[in-house]
Amino acid sequence: MPNPIYLAELNEADYPRVREKDPTLPETHRAWLRGADERVQILRGRGKNPVRYPIRFRAFAERNDVLGIPSFDQAARDDYADEQGRAHTAAL
């Protein structure tokens, strides 16, 4: 199973390192990264730490109109990210 990808990791500077963790992720898509950055700013504006938010790939793709990215079609990745996020939050 792939490692969870957290929202704060989705920026142009960190994305190559993120793809090393999960090579099934698509190459950089600027609209996707821009959407991730907007979400990070919203969370920070609410006083939240975006490092604690794993991506639910399908929902994120739908909100950002990037459904053409094949790797976002995997429900198992959504479920895994949710499980990892809950485990991470519970450990805090």
Predicted region positions:
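N-terminal low-complexity, charged segments
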Residues: 1-92
